[in-house]
Amino acid sequence: MASPVHIKEEPTDGQHVSSESSMKEISDGSLNNNDSGGPSDPPYIVPSRSCLSRSQKKIVEAKVRAIQSEAPIYIVIMKSSSIVVSKQMLEFGAHYAAAYLPAREQTMVLQCKGKIWNTDMVIRNGHRLFLRGGWPKFVCDNGLRLGDICLFQLKKNESKLTMEVHVISREEF
């Protein structure tokens, strides 16, 4: 029998959620590479206000398995606030940001399909992390649309804060 894998859902607006209510269990041991039998970091994290359909979840989990990231992958379903020209910014959930991203404003390098974009990671309200400058160009250059899914993989051992972005087009599910 496959061991349960915990997929963390987290708030993106600074609200606090108990660890029990912020975790979903799925029975797919192939995602869990932890041989110790104890809890480990979830393989991916989805903001609590986002919900993956069954077909989206299946595709995301296959992609996560293929990526084999050391840190959990942050999953974002593109909403109007991320892609509409007048708003274009991307928020990282508070819990993901606190656990995996530095707590200071700086440049974040995004890599996608062999190209790079420098974006500005900014902090609002003391703890909310957003990508701004450079994010609109990333959106445009990659043809991101409402409903597309981006998987943000934190790259270790880079001289600059870097994330590889894997895009799943809405037509794939």
Where are the regions that the model predicts?
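Intrinsically disordered, low-complexity regulatory/interaction regions
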Residues: 1-130, 136-173
